[in-house]
Design a protein with these regions (language model features):
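Active-site mouth of glycoside hydrolases
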Residues: 1-39, 43-46, 174
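Substrate-binding clefts and catalytic carboxylate motifs of secreted carbohydrate-active enzymes
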Residues: 30-33, 41-44, 48-59, 63-184
């Protein structure tokens, strides 16, 4: 996952790139050719050839993190016409029932050690609050926070999914991420 994208963040070593292409585009393809019912793509996201526009809408499989990591508005999805979207989403807190399995009432604070030990996204709590404040006032009671972040997450998924469904034939599928992530 995201192997080709990783190369854009590191020095381009032609030996490593050649080995990557040989393994993922040739050797693995050869090994699975007898399993014709199993679709195979060498990387996700994927353009039309190795290291080509793996975020372009017109080809392959895309990951779209402009909403969430890029703090774009939820309607950003409506400007995109991807062929297949295999990663997108928006984080929310788990239910209060789940929160009570890992935090005491005195730890009901996003900055507490109990919450920070579960937050795997750098700046994730700030991003959740950014999107929450786009729609709602910040809640006075912590117990309202999981519910409100869940509404924002649902709105994100709904907005994107409805757009992609309206474009069936152009967009042939989407997979959202961060829904029901493991918190306890």
């Amino acid at each position: 996952n995201e192997i080709e994208a990783m190369f854009s963040y590191m020095p381009r070593n032609s030996k490593i790139i050649k080995a990557y292409i040989e393994f993922f585009y040739h050797q693995l393809t050869e090994h699975i050719k007898d399993y014709l019912t199993v679709p195979y793509i060498p990387s996700s996201p994927l353009g039309d050839k190795p290291f080509s526009q793996n975020t372009a809408d017109g080809v392959g499989d895309t990951h779209m993190w402009n909403v969430w990591h890029g703090l774009k508005p939820l309607n950003y999805y409506e400007k995109r016409y991807t062929r297949f979207l295999s990663e997108f989403g928006l984080e929310s807190l788990p239910s209060m029932k789940a929160i009570k399995t890992f935090a005491t009432e005195s730890e009901f604070d996003l900055a507490s050690d109990a919450f920070m030990s579960h937050q795997k996204c750098e700046g994730g709590n700030e991003k959740m609050m950014f999107y929450l404040k786009e729609r709602f006032d910040a809640p006075i009671h912590f117990e309202d926070l999981p519910y409100l972040t869940g509404i924002v997450q649902a709105d994100c998924i709904e907005s994107a999914t409805l757009h992609f469904r309206r474009n069936k034939g152009r967009c042939n599928g989407s997979v959202f991420w961060q829904f029901n992530d493991v918190w306890n």
